[in-house]
A protein has these predicted regions:
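Beta-propeller domains
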Residues: 11-14, 25-98, 104-131, 166-168, 190-362, ...
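Structural signature of eukaryotic scaffold interfaces centered on beta-propeller domains
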Residues: 11-30, 76-99, 140-151, 201-207, ...
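Short, conserved, GDST-rich strand-edge loop motifs in beta-rich repeat architectures
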Residues: 23, 28-29, 36-43, 90-101, ...
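Surface-exposed loop and turn segments in beta-propeller and other repeat-based domains
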Residues: 63-83, 128-140, 186-195, 248-259, ...
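Asp-box/WD-like beta-propeller blade repeats and closely related beta-sheet repeat scaffolds
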Residues: 117-204
């Protein structure tokens, strides 16, 4: 046996797409494929995963080159993530030899979870399906949302608690085994005042996590509830956790008028103790806003560091929900931070604008680039001449920071409220200038199959909202 063991070539190495630092990840080869979720807004056909050619040298650039269509209807695909990423290189992990091979795709409406094997992207296939009953039984949660690959497992946030309408107990986070994909159990030991959930991320070496709030299922599943918005009943708090103790150590209220504190984006270099959060709308003036949060002397703080004003509009140009305001709110629905922690991208889904901020000074974001496409009133066409329905929504950045991709659907029922009628799915790309600035690529416009909308994007080999880095940049 010993002789047999000695003859086995020792070639086990960490996945080459795992990087110790964000700086090293930026030097990796550029992506040639993207993975984008397709959802059927009325549930008339199954949702799917599109594999898209993003190699400018390819004859199929900007085209869907493979699809994985699910066996069920009514899932509503939304966010998704990898089984493993650079967090596997943490000195605390026992999983250094995992590979970035599987995409974990939850159905936000069905609470079903799919595991898709993309080792051969053009032959991607379903590996495992976790039925909603297992999610409910093992966690007491429903409506799984955000996926993050942690050092000891896959973390999944949820938007619903138990019961048919998801309001029996607060939502939270649960952990899945990153090899078997079994659900292990709830994350929280002490949740403190947290009773809503949306996004979450962390600083692994500093051992803390931050989470945000959207609303409970009755507040979003059938559309935005205007009465709840105007009475400030959506989420407006950030929660800070001791990651290992699984304990809420501090909650910051951004103010009840700052409705829907959504995406949280910590700095990628773990030496830096700050990050950003986007707030959809201020109910006193319809502004969108960016908040910077940071830790100092053991305490967390948050401050509004950028605002985006609404745009005036004629009543007849607006959907019924906005006619009384005679204005279009920017509706900040997604943000993303480049790996060098320099550029923050802000999707203004209402006004049809993608903004780029220079956040080299995180307390003083400076607008450094902007492009318009779509929008409730503007309806700006893409440079290709095609209509871009809805507005810029889920945004993803290449590892080297030179390319920015985005899609246009927010959430099926909200799409229909703010943009009545079906506007079609789209995915576009902008190139980033050497000193900032954005230019839409007129050759890149992905058409999706009829009847589908498009939501989150993941890039081959990792991107800027996936990987957690455990070592400082050098």
């Amino acid at each position: 046996v010993r002789q047999q063991l000695e003859e086995i070539p020792m070639t086990v190495r960490p996945d080459p797409t795992f990087h110790a630092t964000a700086k090293l990840a930026m030097q990796a080869p550029p992506e040639t494929l993207a993975f984008t979720l397709m959802l059927s807004p009325d549930g008339s056909q199954p949702d799917g995963l599109a594999v898209i050619d993003v190699d400018p040298k390819s004859s199929k650039y900007g085209q869907i080159v493979h699809q994985v269509i699910m066996p069920n209807k009514g899932d509503e695909f939304h966010h998704f993530g990898w089984n493993a990423c650079s967090s596997a290189l943490s000195p605390l992990t026992g999983h250094a030899f995992l590979e970035r091979r599987y995409l974990i795709i939850p159905g936000i409406r069905s609470s079903r979870i799919y595991v898709v094997d993309v080792k051969e992207p053009l032959k991607a296939k379903i590996h495992k399906i976790i039925e909603p009953e297992e999610v409910f039984a093992k966690t007491g949660y429903s409506r799984p949302h955000t996926i993050h690959c942690g050092p000891e497992g896959i973390y999944v946030s949820t938007l619903g608690g138990g019961g048919a309408d998801g309001t029996d107990g607060p939502p939270g986070i649960f952990i899945m085994d990153c090899e078997t994909f079994d659900i292990i159990g709830r994350y929280e030991i002490d949740r403190g005042p947290q009773n809503k959930q949306y996004d979450f991320w962390w600083n692994l070496p500093r051992d803390y996590m931050v989470s945000s709030e959207w609303g409970l299922p009755p507040q979003f599943e059938n559309g935005l509830v205007p009465e709840d918005l105007l009475s400030n009943k959506y989420g407006h708090r950030l929660h800070f956790w001791n990651l290992r103790e699984r304990k809420n150590v501090q909650t910051i209220d951004l103010g009840a008028n700052h409705q829907m504190a959504l995406e949280v984006r910590p700095a990628h270099d773990p030496v830096k103790e700050y990050g950003f959060c986007g707030v959809v709308v201020d109910t006193t003036n319809l502004e969108g806003s960016i908040w910077t949060w940071w830790r100092e002397d053991g305490k967390f703080h948050a401050k509004k560091t950028a605002t985006i004003p609404p745009e005036g509009a004629k009543k007849d140009d607006l959907p019924p929900m906005l006619q009384g305001f005679e204005a279009v709110p920017p509706l900040v629905t997604d943000i993303d931070l480049s790996l060098d922690d320099r550029h923050l991208y802000v999707a203004c889904w209402g006004t049809g604008e993608m903004r780029q901020y220079d956040v080299s000074d995180p307390m003083n974001p400076k607008l450094s680039g902007s492009v318009h496409v779509g929008g409730i009133v503007r309806k700006t066409k893409h440079p290709s001449g095609k209509d871009f329905g809805y507005g810029p929504q889920m945004v993803e950045i290449s590892r080297d920071g030179k390319r920015v991709y985005w899609t246009n659907s927010l959430y099926s029922t909200w799409d229909d409220q703010f943009y009545p009628g079906d506007r079609g799915a789209a995915m576009v790309k902008a190139d980033v200038g050497e000193n900032g600035g954005l230019t839409l690529d007129e050759k890149f416009f992905v058409d999706f199959p009829k009847g589908y909308r498009s939501h989150q994007i993941r890039l081959e080999g990792g991107d800027c909202s996936t990987d957690s880095f455990c070592y400082p940049n050098v």
